[in-house]
A protein has these predicted regions:
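Catalytic cores of soluble, metal-dependent hydrolases
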Residues: 2-10, 14-80, 92, 99-103, ...
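Short, well-ordered beta-to-alpha junction loops that form the rim of enzyme active sites
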Residues: 7, 83-87, 113, 164, ...
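Active-site histidine-anchored catalytic micro-motif
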Residues: 77-147, 251
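Active-site environment of divalent metal-dependent phosphoester hydrolases
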Residues: 118, 167-169, 264-266
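Flexible, glycine/proline-enriched loop segments at strand-loop-helix junctions
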Residues: 118-124, 134-135, 158-162, 184-188
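Active-site glycine-rich loop that binds ribose-phosphate moieties when present
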Residues: 127-169, 195
Length: 288
């Protein structure tokens, strides 16, 4: 696995999550992953430029990130991206999409307390980290929906959300109209995360060339992950998620894992940083 830092905060109201990749490095990310027998490498950090036009700067950043992801997948079977606000997902999965072009569609499991499916017309805040899934599905600013290759990078029937518990009606309406599968937090509590992840895996690997997992850390309960941009109570157990990722990591169709919205300034005793490292370690087959 090739690990890439996505040092971006321009898409969020609290921009301090741009510090996430550097803090993870300082907390021993690569030292922990060094024992992985098949090799885990650090491919560098893509950093945002700041400017007045947020959409323009975000598109420039995502273009660079997509290129980095694409290049990494030419020499590695999988990528890991650590952020950084969740607008980085537009770059991450655009890069994966381009890397597998011609082999088939991309499947994606989106683990998040929010739907991230606003458009500029529906977003109360205008923050781009509330729009990345909509952009990947082809709904949003042209500079972001047309990243790399024009058109949607994801088909609705190959996407599912897990852990949703905070959203606006316009987002739900868009996803319902498109037919995107949503496992909300009530379903996770009712059936257990392991079963929901199994169902999601079966869904996104059907008729696809491979699948990815995008995690917004606010999907996790704030007790386990306090260092996030937009915490929402009553979330997924961090340990349960690590166990599920350990299983997912053994699946040959997994193309990449993205972990976004780590805000070091809100962390408590590096609890969130350690959890991010544990999640990556579980995915590459290392025990805690």
């Amino acid at each position: 696995m090739s690990i890439i830092g996505a040092a971006v905060g321009i898409g969020a109201q609290d921009t301090r999550c741009r510090q996430g990749p550097d803090r993870l490095q300082a907390c021993g990310l690569m030292a922990r992953l060094a024992d992985e027998p098949h090799g885990v490498s650090w491919s560098g950090t893509v950093r945002e430029d700041t400017g007045v036009d947020v959409v323009y700067e975000s598109a420039r950043f995502c273009e660079r990130l997509a290129r980095k992801v694409y290049d990494a997948l030419q020499n590695n079977p999988r990528i890991g991206v650590v952020g950084g606000d969740h607008s980085c997902a537009i770059g991450t999965w655009s890069g994966v999409y381009q890397a597998i072009a011609g082999n088939g569609p991309l499947g994606l499991i989106w683990i998040d307390a929010h739907m991230d499916s606003h458009t500029p017309d529906t977003s109360p805040s205008g923050a781009l980290h509330g729009m990345p899934l909509a952009c990947l599905l082809g709904h949003g600013p042209g500079a972001l929906t047309g990243l790399g290759v024009s058109g949607p990078k994801l088909a609705p029937q190959h996407v599912c959300l897990i852990g949703v518990r905070s959203f606006e009606p316009a987002e739900a309406a868009l996803l319902q109209k498109l037919g995107v599968r949503v496992f909300d937090m009530d379903q996770v509590r009712r059936h257990g995360l392991a079963r929901v992840m199994d169902d999601a895996l079966a869904y996104v690997q059907k008729n696809t060339a491979g699948f990815g997992i995008s995690i917004d850390l606010d999907a996790i309960d704030p007790h386990d992950a306090p260092g996030v941009g937009s915490p929402v109570s009553a979330g997924i157990c961090g340990k349960d998620l690590a166990e599920s990722l350990s299983k997912m990591g053994r699946h040959p169709g997994l193309l990449g894992l993205e972990i976004a919205e780590f805000n070091p300034d809100k962390d408590v005793n590096n609890r969130t940083a350690k959890l991010v490292i544990d999640l990556l370690a579980a995915t590459v087959g290392l025990r805690g």
